[in-house]
Amino acid sequence: MKHILFFLLFAGNVALAQNDPYKFQITGAEDTVIYLANYYGEKLYYADTAYTDAEGKFSFEAIDSDKQGKYAVVAPGPRYFELIIADGENIHMKTDTTNLTGNMEVLESVNNTIMYDYIKYLTAKKEQREKLVAQLEENEDRPKAAEKIKKQYGNLNSEVLDYQKAVRENYPDKFGAAEIFMSIDPEVPAELKENREAGYYWFKDHYFDHIDLTDDRIVRTPIYHTKLVTYLNKTVIQTPDTLIPAIDELIARMDPNSDVFKYTVHYTTYNFETSKIMGLDEVFVHMVDTYYKTGMATWMDEEKLKNIIEKSDAKKKTLIGKTVPNLTLADTTGENWISIKRDIETEYVVLFFYDPDCGHCKKETPILVEFFNTYEGDDLAIYAVSSDNTQKWNKFINKNEMNFYNVSIPQKAFESADFATRLITTGKTNYESLKYTETFDIFSTPKIFVLDKDRVIRAKDIGVDQIGDFLKRFKEAASKEKTAESN
């Protein structure tokens, strides 16, 4: 079952207790085990266990007030139905195994009556929508009929929105209504719809208007997680300069001691730590500097806090826009030390970190060789850093005809600390170069950086097949900027 994580550490039987506030009956699930799971973000976690009697009846004890939110009752299969535990309500619900959600009867609980009435309403609207879609396909060659169907389709959306708003107005103090209201996106004012840019910024600034960021219950529903993911990865323009202030403004609206703050900071940090979009690791570094180093991440134990800070600090040196250290390594003779700043004068340098035994490196290297051999212009050099310094390295270079600056660290530098120290004190190289895996955050190969004439990082973690397109776009942008400055 999607997203359900259970830690089944329990013993003994859980009997049906008449005084329990949450009572259920599932016809068709007699004499079996049932689990209660709580949402935290998008995932479900084990919360409690019950056993059904001969009629499929069972119950759960009351939860703590600080654990209110959306839950799921999980039956064998596994199959489950959702419910809301909030506002101190007693709950009485019954259904059957033929359709746990569709056949649900809510006998007691305003919140769950709200939720299941809404589910039934949406199900009916979905059927209407599907019919309209089919009619639209049948009438695609009849403009007038198609336009009429589109209008009906738009009316359906308006009806759903009106229903959602009405529920909120009718039940202002019920979490079930608040959860439905959370799913509504803010509507851009009519006067701004014609101005795309103004409309976008209004929408971004008001994105969380329908969510009470002071209510910790929202992190125990999947809706807040979904809204947060959409905001971070789609709503806000995907550059550090726009993301960082938007994130800080959002978090500033939260109580630092709240579950909402904890969830938002934790997920946002993880999201950009694992992002595949080039340059967004800067957002991860900002999150660690702002919320972890300052002692605000009180939920982190000492070891985990130390690890995330170390990881962030390692990434700082290789953020987009940073000038790299003067990487200076030895060629295949082990005698000539080549500096990317002192000895290479080309406008651009591609740093290519690889391992001759790495399977992916074996595939990418010939592509890089082909790209370089057919590259038009003399403004590019490739500084290829091998993790191996043996004959295997030389064979790899010869086999692939790598007409690059082929460099590595001589074996003796690994074997003798005195030798390594002399290399530094005599100016042959530097500490950052001998520790280049740490300096450039190399935890897997191949790894690519594109540097400009000042050896500033302009691109990183891209594929070999992307280098050419990136350089073309970068040169065009630089040319336009230069022209604009001259004018």
Model-derived regions, located:
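Bacterial Sec-dependent N-terminal signal peptides
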Residues: 1-25, 460, 478, 484-487
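A non-transmembrane, solvent-exposed segment enriched in polar/low-complexity residues
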Residues: 18-172, 181-210
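Surface-exposed loop/edge segments in extracytoplasmic proteins
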Residues: 42-49, 336-338, 457-458
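Thiol/disulfide oxidoreductase modules built on the thioredoxin-like
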Residues: 183, 414-473
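A cross-family structural signal marking well-folded subdomains
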Residues: 241-300
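N-proximal helix/coil linker or "cap" segments that precede and/or mark the start of modular domains
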Residues: 274-331, 342-346, 485-487
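Short active-site neighborhood of thiol/selenol oxidoreductases, capturing the structured segment around
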Residues: 338-368, 381-385
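Structural microenvironment flanking redox-active thiols in thiol-disulfide oxidoreductases
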Residues: 363-402, 411-418, 432-433
